[in-house]
């Protein structure tokens, strides 16, 4: 026998604890709160001899009735207790038959006659959600907030014949937070603490220790019940009073006003303490000043000139939307569920079926409220999901915001993934039916998880190089947009879910993103063909295919980034331990070129994200569309807001601001050497941010006479003409040994003549248009310079006579070392050939290395000793032997000399986005 104080205690195998002082209870009331009080009282050993509750509604029993029936407790479902002021005889007999010693009323909407109230030995106790004697009446919580009280709480009191006037048994209080709503206050304090207090009150009565403290009349107030008809907003008041009125009716009954002839209810009010953001005016009946629909919600104004923001709006038909979307006509992005999330959805479907017992099958289109659910069922749904879905805490408004099952599951999944539930992704698309599919292209800046116009509304045309037509207008990011994107990325890193996420979960999101890229590869490749002129078949395999591989590769690295332990000299007689940690840098900027729009994004951003950073990425001004489509897919994959930000626009404005921004800790750039130098300078002067640069190239390809000539011709052409020559590692100069030079040139020209130049969406096309008009003109000038300097134009050198920016594949021979063609990169389909004397290995190496560039290089020979010697001597970040363009996601890629420094791809790329911290401790 164990003893606690003076009470005898016995423990049984069921785990329930029984004290000596226990009571027989009648529970009178309803709701989830009533159910929880019932369950906790039974758990503490009290015997509930009867539950008196309301009748089933639309075939659904109240949660309290369900719990009691499951336990075998007698349940009485009474439509009323009295008629014409007198207790119904049958009801009184049923009540007295259970022999209760105490009535417990946790939440009761019915009038209980006094003879029932006074019948038990210990009378009756009632839970009331205010600090009595203040706010007597049925809408106590509402009035606590409406009146701007700084303290809220509840009272458990002894019932008498007055209206909430009985003696106090116990009270509890809490501070009212500035933006508390009725729901927030109830969920945070009144519900959980109220359950505990009811159980404590019953035990105090059982122990004979329950006080009866008369309520003072000083400070007593009584307010009437708040219903929809008297919850209309009166606008001639201060912002704080308006705020209190709105939150004091949130969620029930809901403060409302008239907008465009329709009743609109406001939810989620907060006082605006900062400057009023820009927005679109919205006329509101009775308001002296129009509201403003902003990206953060609907801004309202009091008569004192101060403002508040409302987060959500509900219309007469029950539909609820984020207030920021009042004028929006965009489409809502759909989250695609993982296998684990599908299981959660099935669990929730069972919960819906239990609540909507009158609905035979829960379908995607099933509407929670149109199927008969009430506000009480909302509380039950939220609580059951919390219990059965790993503690997931929804808010009541989540149900109102997504009343149909399919939409509700979307909201739940977003919540599970740690996304902001306040605003869903809305995408305004430019849609085109092309390549036998409907291509849907976002065209706005993507900042903090939302597509948005540029701050100043500026746009520019993005051009289809196949015919020179305008694809669409794209937002032209301003300095303000860059600053917003950086701020969003910083907040996501320092305060958001991303910064708290474990590495394996980060990898899961990246795997999911890779899957989505693969699932949408036809659309992405089509956009790449439209926007950059990439041949569709090549775009599928390389532009998109390698992007998928890159994200999968780095997703696997997420949980394998680790430091090391290092033996150091011990501080004897103590000991020391030194270890290193690899940590993310923070906010990273990424600026990518136009030749592989999505692949260049993937090469840099995958490593950046795997390391745990957040990013702001500026795509090339002429090819922004796949980057913006990528942003949409990142939301579908579940990336939290602010982790990925895409800002289309110019290098001179957006790119320069990124290089100068003090909150950016790393910048990764692929582009020209002159721009790379400017970026490096700006990064150094601003805050010495870490930089990795992949810049220009003039990659030499040496072809010896002992090579496999057929392969050398085929690979040599690929080295130059792959992706229209718009390839950073393209062979900028071919050195062909004298004895095979003429045959090599002849074969190359023969093969060029077989190439089909045309529409990149045509599956038989080999060679598409150059990326943009200015680049085509630069290539034509390059050829003119070569001819003027005396190089021999063997083939091509002209624009193709058809619409668009097409250029003939071009071959120059007799290129001497002093010529412009020998020194400068064309970045186009121009083969520059120089011959070298038979056997002069060191001489050709000297010529190959006499450039400031060092990105890639190649050699073709059957002699392995010669191949290895040449690979050692070539000054380049990559050397290809008897192959070319063979890059892989696991192999580091990057240049030397003025081709830059730092690596993309492979494990080494992770180090570009990590910092090493050394920790030493003594013990």
Swiss-Prot record:
Signal sequence interval, chain numbering: none
Residues involved in NADP(+) binding: 592-594, 618-621, 651-656, 671-672, 694-695, 778, 825-827
Recorded catalytic reaction(s): these are: (6R)-10-formyltetrahydrofolate + NADP(+) + H2O = (6S)-5,6,7,8-tetrahydrofolate + CO2 + NADPH + H(+)
- The Carrier domain covers 339-416
Q: In which tissues is it expressed?
A: Highly expressed in pancreas, heart, brain and skeletal muscle.
Q: Which residues carry this modification: N6-acetyllysine?
A: 903
Any Pfam family matching the protein: PP-binding
Residues modified as N6-succinyllysine are: 60, 681, 788
Main localization, broad class:
mitochondrion
Q: Which residues does the annotated region (Hydrolase domain) include?
A: 23-331
Transit pept. (range): 1-19
Name positions with the PTM Phosphoserine. 31, 650
Task: State the CDD domains in the record.
Answer: ALDH_F1L_FTFDH, FDH_Hydrolase_C, FMT_core_FDH_N
Cell location: Mitochondrion
Which Gene3D superfamilies does the record match to this protein?
Answer: ACP-like, Aldehyde Dehydrogenase, Chain A, domain 1, Aldehyde Dehydrogenase, Chain A, domain 2, Formyl transferase, C-terminal domain, Formyl transferase, N-terminal domain
Q: Which UniProt keywords apply?
A: Acetylation, Mitochondrion, NADP, One-carbon metabolism, Oxidoreductase, Phosphopantetheine, Phosphoprotein, Transit peptide
Q: Mind telling me how this protein is modified after translation?
A: Phosphopantetheinylation at Ser-375 by AASDHPPT is required for the formyltetrahydrofolate dehydrogenase activity.
A GO cellular component annotation here is: mitochondrial matrix
Question: Which residues does the record list as O-(pantetheine 4'-phosphoryl)serine (modified residue)?
Answer: 375
Main EC class of this protein?
A: oxidoreductase
List the GO molecular function terms: aldehyde dehydrogenase (NAD+) activity; formyltetrahydrofolate dehydrogenase activity
Gene Ontology biological process: 10-formyltetrahydrofolate catabolic process; biosynthetic process; fatty acid beta-oxidation; folic acid metabolic process; NADPH regeneration; one-carbon metabolic process
**Domain comment quoted from the record:** The N-terminal hydrolase domain has an NADP-independent formyltetrahydrofolate hydrolase activity, releasing formate and tetrahydrofolate.
Q: What is this protein called?
A: Mitochondrial 10-formyltetrahydrofolate dehydrogenase
* Source organism (scientific name): Homo sapiens
């Amino acid at each position: 026998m164990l003893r606690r104080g003076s009470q005898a205690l016995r423990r049984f195998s069921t785990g329930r604890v029984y004290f000596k002082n226990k009571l027989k209870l009648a529970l009178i009331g309803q709701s989830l709160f009533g159910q929880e009080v019932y369950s906790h009282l039974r758990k503490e050993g009290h015997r509930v001899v009867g539950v008196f509750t309301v009748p089933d509604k639309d075939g659904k029993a109240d949660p309290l009735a369900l719990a009691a029936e499951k336990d075998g407790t007698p349940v009485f479902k009474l439509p009323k207790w009295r008629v014409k002021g007198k207790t119904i005889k049958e009801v009184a007999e049923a009540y007295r038959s259970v022999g209760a010693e105490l009535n417990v009323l946790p939440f009761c909407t019915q009038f209980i006659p006094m003879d029932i109230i006074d019948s038990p030995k210990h009378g009756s106790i009632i839970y009331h959600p205010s600090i009595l004697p203040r706010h007597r009446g049925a809408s106590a919580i509402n009035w606590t907030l409406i009146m701007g009280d700084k303290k809220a709480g509840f009272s458990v009191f002894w019932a008498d014949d007055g209206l909430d006037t009985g003696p106090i048994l116990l009270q509890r209080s809490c501070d009212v937070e500035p933006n508390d709503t009725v729901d927030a206050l109830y969920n945070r304090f009144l519900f959980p603490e109220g359950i505990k207090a009811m159980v404590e009150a019953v035990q105090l009565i059982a122990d004979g220790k329950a006080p009866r403290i008369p309520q003072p009349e000083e400070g007593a107030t009584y307010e009437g019940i708040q219903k929809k008809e008297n919850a209309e907003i009166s606008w001639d008041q201060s912002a704080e009073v308006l705020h209190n009125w709105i939150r004091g009716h949130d969620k029930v009954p809901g403060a409302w006003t008239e907008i465009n002839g329709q009743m609109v209810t406001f939810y989620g009010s907060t006082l605006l303490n900062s400057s009023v953001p820009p927005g679109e005016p919205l006329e509101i009946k009775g308001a002296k000043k129009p509201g403003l629909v902003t990206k953060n919600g609907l801004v309202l104004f009091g008569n004192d000139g101060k403002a508040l923001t409302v987060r959500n709006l509900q219309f007469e038909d029950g539909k609820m939307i984020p207030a920021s979307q009042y004028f929006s006509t965009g489409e809502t992005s759909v989250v695609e569920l993982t296998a684990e999330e599908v299981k959660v959805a099935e669990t929730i479907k069972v919960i819906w079926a239990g609540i909507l017992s009158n609905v035979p099958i829960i379908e995607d289109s099933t509407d929670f409220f149109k199927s008969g659910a009430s506000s009480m069922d909302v509380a039950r749904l939220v609580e059951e999901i919390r219990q059965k879905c790993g503690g997931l805490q929804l808010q009541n408004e989540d149900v109102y915001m997504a009343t149909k099952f399919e939409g509700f599951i979307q909201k739940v999944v977003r919540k599970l993934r740690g996304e902001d539930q306040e605003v869903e992704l809305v995408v305004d698309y430019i849609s085109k039916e092309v390549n036998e599919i409907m291509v849907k292209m976002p065209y706005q800046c993507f900042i903090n998880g939302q597509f948005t116009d540029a701050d100043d509304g500026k746009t520019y045309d993005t051009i289809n190089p196949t015919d020179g037509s305008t694809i669409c207008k794209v937002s032209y990011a301003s300095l303000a947009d860059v600053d917003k994107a950086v701020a969003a990325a910083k907040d996501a890193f320092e305060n958001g879910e991303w910064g708290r996420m474990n590495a394996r979960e980060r990898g899961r999101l990246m795997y999911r993103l890779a899957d989505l890229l693969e699932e949408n590869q036809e659309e992405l490749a089509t956009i790449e063909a439209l926007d950059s002129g990439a041949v569709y078949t090549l775009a599928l395999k390389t532009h998109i295919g390698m992007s998928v591989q890159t994200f999968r590769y780095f997703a696997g690295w997420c949980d394998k980034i680790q430091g090391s332990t290092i033996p150091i000299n011990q501080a004897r007689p103590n000991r020391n331990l030194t270890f290193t940690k690899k940590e993310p840098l923070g906010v990273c900027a990424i600026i990518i070129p136009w030749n592989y729009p999505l692949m260049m994004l993937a090469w840099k951003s995958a490593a950046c994200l795997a390391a745990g950073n957040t990013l702001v990425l500026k795509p090339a001004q002429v090819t922004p569309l796949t980057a913006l489509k990528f942003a949409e897919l990142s939301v579908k994959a579940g990336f939290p807001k602010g982790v990925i930000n895409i800002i289309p626009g110019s290098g001179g404005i957006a790119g320069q601001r990124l290089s100068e921004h003090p909150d950016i800790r790393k910048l990764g750039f692929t582009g020209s050497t002159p721009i790379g130098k400017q970026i490096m300078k700006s990064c150094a002067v601003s805050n010495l941010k870490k930089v990795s640069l992949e810049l220009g190239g003039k990659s030499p390809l040496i072809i010896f006479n002992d090579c496999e000539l057929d392969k050398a011709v085929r690979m040599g052409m690929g080295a130059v003409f792959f992706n229209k020559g718009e390839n950073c590692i393209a062979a900028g100069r071919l050195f062909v040994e004298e004895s095979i030079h003429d045959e090599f040139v002849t074969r190359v020209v023969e093969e060029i003549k077989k190439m089909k130049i045309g529409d990149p969406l045509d599956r038989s096309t080999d060679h598409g248009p150059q990326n943009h008009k200015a680049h085509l003109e630069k290539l034509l000038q390059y050829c003119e310079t070569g001819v003027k300097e005396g190089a021999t134009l063997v083939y091509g050198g002209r624009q193709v006579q058809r619409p668009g920016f097409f250029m003939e594949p071009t071959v120059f021979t007799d290129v001497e070392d002093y010529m412009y063609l020998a020194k400068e990169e064309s970045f186009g389909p121009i083969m520059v050939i120089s011959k070298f004397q038979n056997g002069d290995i060191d001489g050709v190496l000297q010529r190959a290395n006499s450039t400031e560039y060092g990105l890639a290089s190649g050699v073709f020979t059957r002699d392995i000793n010669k191949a290895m010697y040449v690979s050692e001597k070539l000054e380049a970040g990559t050397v290809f032997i008897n192959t070319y363009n063979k890059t892989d996601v696991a192999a580091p890629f990057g240049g030397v000399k003025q081709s830059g420094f730092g690596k993309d791809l492979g494990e080494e790329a992770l180090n570009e986005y990590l910092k090493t911290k050394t920790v030493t401790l003594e013990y």
